[in-house]
């Protein structure tokens, strides 16, 4: 009977295992069937908005006040106001009419830091219109507020009473001076 050392058996058995561990995985298919797009690193091919820069305008900082949402647009017509109110009603928000008699824009009067008296808090016209489904009713409230205070800034806000946040705010009427 021939005796073989255990070291020789171990060496013989380990050699093929190490060779198998070193071979790369070749089970992936070739990507020859996929379409290939050629990358272009040339920066001159990037499109530019240079032609549109000439028609862009800057908001004039003197003589024009920015108020609320949409303040960069001309005053909204009654039809446009109706569509905005219909939008906030569709979202399920509660419409509310507010007015300001002096300054309808953010201003610092008593302190340099923001606070209660910086023009963001306006006087509420009556109560919020809970349960309102008709946009014309909201515009009727705006007209009544305007009749009572003709030289007031009037805005419409949309309040989400579930999240308890104001979601939209826009100017419905400004004094003739502005």
UniProtKB/Swiss-Prot annotation:
Q: Which SUPFAM superfamilies match?
A: RuBisCO, small subunit
Compartments reported by the entry: Plastid, Chloroplast
| Chaperone among keywords | no
InterPro entries named among the record's database cross-references? RuBisCO_ssu, RuBisCO_ssu_dom, RuBisCO_ssu_N, RuBisCO_ssu_sf
GO term, biological process aspect, one: reductive pentose-phosphate cycle
Which CDD domains does the record associate with it? RuBisCO_small
Please state the protein's primary subcellular location: plastid
**One MF term in GO for this entry?**
ribulose-bisphosphate carboxylase activity
Record keyword Plastid present: yes
Pfam name, any one: RbcS
Output the SMART domains linked to this UniProt entry: RuBisCO_small
From which residue to which does the transit peptide run? Answer: 1-54
- What keywords are assigned to this protein? Calvin cycle, Carbon dioxide fixation, Chloroplast, Photorespiration, Photosynthesis, Plastid, Transit peptide
What function does the entry list?
RuBisCO catalyzes two reactions: the carboxylation of D-ribulose 1,5-bisphosphate, the primary event in carbon dioxide fixation, as well as the oxidative fragmentation of the pentose substrate. Both reactions occur simultaneously and in competition at the same active site. Although the small subunit is not catalytic it is essential for maximal activity.
Other comment: The basic functional RuBisCO is composed of a large chain homodimer in a 'head-to-tail' conformation. In form I RuBisCO this homodimer is arranged in a barrel-like tetramer with the small subunits forming a tetrameric 'cap' on each end of the 'barrel'.
What family, per the record?
Belongs to the RuBisCO small chain family.
Oligomeric form and interacting partners: Heterohexadecamer of 8 large and 8 small subunits.
Q: Which PANTHER family match?
A: RIBULOSE BISPHOSPHATE CARBOXYLASE SMALL CHAIN 1, CHLOROPLASTIC (PTHR31262), RIBULOSE BISPHOSPHATE CARBOXYLASE SMALL SUBUNIT, CHLOROPLASTIC 2 (PTHR31262:SF19)
Q: What name is this protein filed under?
A: Ribulose bisphosphate carboxylase small subunit, chloroplastic
Q: What is the lineage of its organism?
A: Eukaryota, Viridiplantae, Streptophyta, Embryophyta, Tracheophyta
């Amino acid at each position: 009977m021939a005796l073989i050392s255990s070291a020789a058996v171990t060496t013989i058995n380990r050699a093929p295992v190490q060779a198998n561990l070193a071979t790369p995985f070749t089970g992936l298919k070739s990507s020859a069937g996929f379409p290939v797009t050629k990358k272009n690193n040339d920066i001159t091919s990037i499109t530019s908005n240079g032609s549109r820069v000439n028609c862009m305008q800057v908001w004039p900082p003197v003589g024009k006040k920015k108020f609320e949402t949409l303040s960069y647009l001309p005053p909204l017509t009654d039809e446009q106001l109706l569509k905005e109110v219909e939008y906030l009603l569709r979202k399920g928000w509660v419409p509310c009419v507010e007015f300001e008699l002096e300054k309808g824009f953010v201003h610092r009067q008593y302190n340099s830091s923001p606070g209660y008296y910086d023009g963001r808090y306006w006087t509420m016209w009556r109560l919020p219109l809970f349960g309102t489904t008709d946009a014309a009713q909201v515009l009727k409230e705006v007209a009544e507020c305007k009749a009572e205070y003709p030289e007031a800034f009037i805005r419409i806000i949309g309040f989400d009473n579930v999240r308890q946040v104001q979601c939209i705010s826009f100017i419905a009427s400004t004094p003739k001076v502005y």
